[in-house]
Amino acid sequence: MKTNKIVFIFGPTAVGKSDILFHFPKGVAEVISVDSIQVYKEFDIASCKPSIELRSHIRHHLVDFLEPIYEYNLGIFYKESCKIIESLREQKKIPIFVGGSAFYFKHLKYGLPSAPPVSDKVRLYINNLFIRMGKDYLLEELRRVDFKRYESINQNDIYRIKRSLEVYFQTGIPISQFLQRENMFENIVAIGLRRPMDEMKSRIISRVKNMIDCGLLDEIKSLLGKGYDEKTPAFKGIGYREFLLWRSRPCYLLNDIINLIVKNSFLYVKRQMTFFNKLPNVLWFHPDDDLKNILDLIFV
């Protein structure tokens, strides 16, 4: 088992990411949550935070630590993730990033922008070059203007190829001169979880019903009673924001709100899968049928 690896486990809402964690051996790995709502204290039920039982089985980071009034963003997530990775590597443990926030996974893989911003005009120019001339042409351009970057880049990684050329055409400086720090995220095992969409729809309906049964209405009343409202960042999450709509439109019935949560969740699942399907080098599994393969991939 390589202890310098970093594992990504991603998939859409309700696919069953947390369920497989109970099967992980104790003491050899820890989880870093990739979720923009689970970070908030008190917002427990609709965010589907990992249970106390699961957190006692395998330690979770970046869960239930931020006051609801504060914004959580990519910069905080990335900075904290880097610290956690360094700590876990010192302990010879595997960092396992688990969640469904596609935007965060993207920047875990490709890093935060460390070069100057690029104008829309330059970005459009490079993208049009790609559409008209193809990937090989862009690679040849990169070889010409930044041979160091050309030698080190994955030649199937069109995102980084385009980004490298954008920076050069914007600044006249090779991106290799901007990227001096060691990449912490080279040895990535990317595991994607997915189910058929009809199965996902059924699971979402069951999940929302369970939220109501577990006391979501009481949780929201308590949160509103403490002064949290539509300006509170944590209320942006699906399952919370719909109840703010209910408060402003008393004609809505509880069933209308439940149906709206189901609808918004399913639309979010579709957006998540659209993004995740674009990521290269992902090993896709059904979380129920392929559990042994997933465990072997991570721990053997």
From Swiss-Prot:
InterPro entries: Dimethylallyltransferase, IPT, P-loop_NTPase. The keyword Zinc-finger does not apply. Its EC number is 2.5.1.75. The record marks S101, R123 as: Interaction with substrate tRNA. Pfam families: IPPT (PF01715). Keywords: ATP-binding, Magnesium, Nucleotide-binding, Transferase, tRNA processing. Substrate binds at T13, A14, V15, G16, K17, S18. It comes from the Bacteria. ATP binds at G11, P12, T13, A14, V15, G16, K17, S18. Its cofactor is Mg(2+). GO terms for molecular function: ATP binding; tRNA dimethylallyltransferase activity. Residues 35-38 are annotated as: Interaction with substrate tRNA. PANTHER family: TRNA DIMETHYLALLYLTRANSFERASE. Catalyzes the transfer of a dimethylallyl group onto the adenine at position 37 in tRNAs that read codons beginning with uridine, leading to the formation of N6-(dimethylallyl)adenosine (i(6)A). This is tRNA dimethylallyltransferase. It comes from Borrelia recurrentis (strain A1). The gene is miaA.
